Amino acid sequence: MKKLLTSWWIALGLISTPALANKGIAFVHGTGMQTDAYNDYWTGDFVHSVSQGLNDSSMYTVINCDFDQFMWDQKAAGCLAEQLSSFINDKNISEMIVITHSNGGNVIRWIMSNPTFDSRYPAIINATSKVIALAPSSLGTPLADAVHQGNVFESSLGWLLGYGSDAVKQQQVSWMHYYNQNFLNGTAGRPALAKPFKAVVGSDVDSAFWDGDSYCAGYQYQVALETTQNWLDSCSDGFLNCSSQAGAGTVWFTDKQRTRGREPLSHQQSRRDCFNLDVILRNDI
């Protein structure tokens, strides 16, 4: 009788235990055409550190697409959809966390907001558990306006934004307002996104040469972003106003609320392992 009961409880346990989710991470870069985003955009240190939050730290993919195009372009959202679909199918991913940076947040929002635009979109949305949007350009940036108009900042911003590409046009403030009002969900007055879109907001740039923290992710970039910050609000990461970064979904946190030493995250630093950002992401995963 004891053996019978034991067998019964074992069988019941096997039946009632839910299947473990096969969790994975997709790293989605920002503006620009990437062929090796693992090394050139994120760095292996950042990717590996964040991925330690997974049961299997090898279950990640790093996207390489042409985000110099409009977000809906086949080379942008189409490429992203193809690579995400392959990741989901090849690795049997049932719970995908998408980590985006800058304009990458707009491309994934396009997919989440327009499920009938491409037959691959619904499966991607279903597999996605949440989007962690690092410094997303949800409401655009005045710097895109300046670059598109041929301002003197064009040459100094090329490393960050590109030179007069469609993605630059798209991120002009008035253009993003139009897209948010008509094609993208998650902003004020629009339907909510199908899955959580958690924004991490960068609020300032430090470039003091005597401060070692200014050298994280490259001192020269900090100096450049400190300069461009003069065109932005007092709360900005050198490329985006805080209001733009907070414009879609919900704000998870503003840098100083959680970073080591309450350090700000510039637009360059918010895609690198600076001030425990990688650890914060890892723990959330």
Features from the language model and the residues they span:
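Bacterial N-terminal signal peptides that target proteins for export
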Residues: M1-W8
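N-terminal signal peptide c-region/cleavage motif recognized by signal peptidases
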Residues: S16-P18
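Active-site catalytic motif of lipid deacylating hydrolases and related acyltransferases
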Residues: N22-M96
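Serine-dependent carboxylesterase/thioesterase catalytic core
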Residues: I25, H29, A77-F183
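Short, solvent-exposed loop/turn segments at secondary-structure junctions
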Residues: T31-M33, F67-D68, N103-G105, S137-L139, ...
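Short, solvent-exposed loop/turn and secondary-structure capping segments
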Residues: D36-D40, W110-I111, P142-A146, W210-G212
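Short, conserved catalytic or adaptor-binding loops enriched in Gly and charged residues
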Residues: S49-N55, I124, G189-P191, G249
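C-terminal catalytic-base region of ester-bond hydrolases, centering on the histidine
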Residues: R190-I285
